[in-house]
Swiss-Prot record:
Homodimer. Mg(2+) binds at H61, H125. Signal peptide: none annotated. Keywords: Carbohydrate metabolism, Chitin degradation, Cytoplasm, Hydrolase, Magnesium, Metal-binding, Polysaccharide degradation. The gene is chbG. GO terms for molecular function: chitin disaccharide deacetylase activity; deacetylase activity; metal ion binding. InterPro entries: COD_ChbG_bac, Glyco_hydro/deAcase_b/a-brl, YdjC-like. Its main location: cytoplasm. This is Chitooligosaccharide deacetylase. Its cofactor is Mg(2+). CDD domains: YdjC_EF3048_like (cd10803). It is found in: Cytoplasm. One of its GO terms (biological process) is polysaccharide catabolic process. Pathway: Glycan degradation; chitin degradation.
Amino acid sequence: MERVLIVNADDFGLSKGQNYGIVEAYRNGVVTSTTALVNGEAIDHAAQLSRELPALGVGMHFVLTLGKLVSEMPGLTRDGLLGKWIWQMAEEDTLPLDEIAHELACQYQRFIDVFGREPTHLDSHHHVHMFPQIFPIVAHFAAQRGIALRIDRQTVLNADDLPSDLRSTQGFSSEFYGEEITEACFLRILDASAHRGEASLEVMCHPAFVDNIIRQSAYCYPRLTELEVLTSASLKAAIAERGYRPGCFLDI
């Protein structure tokens, strides 16, 4: 059975170092797709680079935890900025869902304005779209527009509630992250997916070159390690040996 492998690099547009790392991992490695933060400091730079790489799938990285909003959103911002207090609000069930739905639409339009096309798919920064309160909003938004959505099926409480026409990969992994960023880890993800019989798999990653913006991130130097692993010739060969076909979300 042929299996589609999507290696998606998050955080396109966060910084020039992030952008260049993603492009390097695409040109000389196994990355096949990326998702862009439309409020990132280097989003215009990301769009410029993407025009030189028409085969690179570019989706939208919905942001509710970092930087400035595209719309007005007093219910979630503090001093005009987003932050990680969204987790506490989710636990207290005080999220401004109407504002979030409006911000999603505004970020989507901003993506089209910057990139000149619709995104290939949607996911989110820090996986906020998987919050139980937010997921239905994003899932129906994606289904209405016919674009794919990253779904962590271990997080979705009731798969029966998914829109019938919503596209996603059968498998998703965020395990290539943190302390163990190795070729062996990456291949274990593939082997586990194959064992489950999944015909399509998305692996999340964050390859980057370190610059001043990336240095401010709690997840900084591991991005360089990711880049090293993702551009290794041995990893590319091992993926091919396992029968995976590189693809993007337009292929599912």
